[in-house]
Amino acid sequence: MSEGGARGKAGAPAGGKVRPDAGTALDGLRDGMTILSGGFGLCGIAEHCIAEIARRGVRNLTVVSNNCGNQGQGLAILLKTRQIRKVVCSFVGGNPDLADQYLAGTVEVELSPQGTLAERIRAGGAGLGGFYTPTGVGTIVADGKEAREIDGRRYVLERPLRGDFAIVRAAVGDRMGNLRFYRTARSFNPLMAMAARITVAEVDKLVDAGALDPDDVHLPGIFVHRIFEAREHKNAVEFRTTREAGSRA
Amino acid sequence: MSWTREDMVRRAAAELRDGDVVNLGIGLPTEVANFVPPEIAVTLHSENGLLGMGPFPDEDHVDPQIINAGKQTVTMLPGASTFDSALSFAMIRGGHVDLAVLGGLEVACNGDLANWTVPGKLITGMGGAMDLAAGARRVVVLQTHVAKDGGAKLVSRLTLPVTALGCVRRVITELGVFDAAGDHFVCVERAPGVEPAEIERTTGARVVFAVSRRRPEPEDG
């Protein structure tokens, strides 16, 4: 890899973290890698990175994401191109591409409750060996996992998740890799960014160091290895609900 | 005459207490937001990372990056905050969310809940359902009394895959309000015109009737 090692450099090297586009930012992506993808459904996803992964045609990918796209968009693009071998997610509803390939046995699905998924990724990024959670006790999620009682409550041991690449989307990023997210486009993005050897940030706006106030940084640049600006995004809406149409509130 | 869907939603809204942080599940529970009693203030939590969720936007203020956990476009109220998914579920598991109103496929009289999958049907995934059921301080289920095929959904023991054990406090159906009480349900309210015999016939567990009088009709508004 261009960083010359197993992992991306956390500090900003002399050559900088900034890349011109998704193509160069995803240098080193190979068949069989694990990709952590931020966002929630089609909200807050790194659209240009997903398009670049499709263009490169790398295969047998494991994708960790709350949803593997939806309605044929987002990560579902990589299902259509048959580049994904395994998906680790919490929800597959509304995703016919994933359902078809799962039923056909061509894609493996590992379901993790949403909070457990988030914490597994956080644990991966935070260097933890796992955690005990009350979520999933007595359910199929607990099958084959260590369980224990702590202070009278039952918990199940969940293991950390890590990846080779993370692709995350942020509203603003600076040249040090510091990120600021927008609204509910944050969701899984900062967590995914923490847990990969190489984290690629796709930002709507790239600014100079110092333009983001240190107190306004949501994710410190230590977790971001490469950053590029992409001003145009589809920002697809899965369910456009409005006051007139769906609610009297 | 049993309750309409709107009656059920209104009755669920009566479970809200002033100052509660509330998470509303996808589907019918989402509509509870439309019937919050005017004299109380509640804060709505959406597990994708929003506290202080407001109603759906008007046509001119749709923002594709402000959505709820059902991926519907929503708004934020003054005082709202946004955060990442790990922090959001820390709020849920940590007992900081006072009430979750969830949909149900089966509820057992010991409080066990099944609401995430039906074997043999298309898989959908549990999303945040297991975390909410296991983590919210109080869980109220809003569901029909029987399944489409007429099978009981209030049962003595779950037949469907578990979402969480012993988590449900109360179930609201079109026939009334039922509390999980261990080896039986306690019917604390009956919908107008619903006789105990109808409830007993359509419930798959023993029912004890705590009151003979039904609750007054929900008021309009």
For each predicted feature, which ranges?
Chain A
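Conserved alpha/beta enzyme-core scaffold
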Residues: 2-249
